[in-house]
A protein has these predicted regions:
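Conserved acidic carboxylate
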Residues: 8
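Acidic, metal-coordinating helix/loop segments flanking the phosphotransfer/catalytic sites
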Residues: 18, 33-52
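A generic structural motif
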Residues: 25-32
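Extreme N-terminal starter segment of soluble prokaryotic enzymes
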Residues: 1-4
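CheY-like receiver
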Residues: 42, 50-125
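Charged docking surfaces used in two-component/phosphorelay signaling
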Residues: 15-23
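Charged, amphipathic alpha-helical segments characteristic of ABC-type P-loop ATPases involved
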Residues: 23-24, 50
Length: 126
């Protein structure tokens, strides 16, 4: 995991996630930080080269599941949210993990380890 997209409308949360990611993976590249459904739909309408998307569920302009109704995202997604009631819905849209805010570096590390295991298994199957 080197190339990351963050969808988060709270600046402090986005900065915190970026800092945690660089602590765990110093060579991580934040491809884009998006703050809204509208920005996200526009961004993912193009060809996106990223390894994982970190996505908050509650954005200022609605819930992020609306993004999936407009564009296909074929990149693994790790949801980062304060709401646990969306977990089942999250796993219907390419989610590999669901981190409840506030989460710790160890939680993020476990999610990234899971991403690495899943992508390694996928590469071996090809």
């Amino acid at each position: 995991m080197k190339r990351v997209v963050i969808i988060e409308d709270e600046t402090a949360a986005a900065v915190n996630l970026r800092n945690m990611l660089t602590t765990i993976t110093p060579d991580v590249e934040i491809v884009e930080v998006l703050e809204s459904i509208e920005e996200s739909v526009e961004f993912f309408s193009r060809d996106v080269d990223a390894d994982v998307v970190f996505m908050d569920i509650h954005l200022a302009d609605g819930d992020s599941f609306r993004i999936f109704k407009s564009v296909d995202i074929n990149i693994p997604i790790i949801f980062t949210t304060a709401y646990d009631e969306y977990a089942l819905e999250a796993f219907k849209v390419n989610s590999i993990d669901y981190l409840l805010k506030p989460f710790k570096v160890e939680d993020l590390r476990r999610a990234l380890d899971k991403l690495h295991r899943l992508t390694a298994t996928e590469r071996m199957a090809q």
